């Protein structure tokens, strides 16, 4: 199972809001909704977030052994 809770902490540490992701960085509300609900997103989305936040995938998601 995907857990995007590290993303919200990283965004807070970098001073970037979800609103800014939508307005300034062209993220769709659907993508943010998927992240909020711990659903799958594309590797491209993970890459874009890593480049934007200057971080690694470990800073935005963790994978657990819990069933989806």
Spans of features found by a protein language model:
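Hydrophobic micro-packing sites on short alpha-helices
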Residues: 45-50, 60-61
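A short, Lys/Arg-rich alpha-helix, primarily the initiator
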Residues: 1-19
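The alpha-helix within a helix-turn-helix
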Residues: 11, 22, 50
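Short, charged recognition helix plus adjacent turn
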Residues: 9-13, 62-68
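Short alpha-helical DNA-recognition segment
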Residues: 15-33
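Helix-turn-helix DNA-binding elements, focusing on the entry/boundary residues of the two helices
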Residues: 18, 43-46
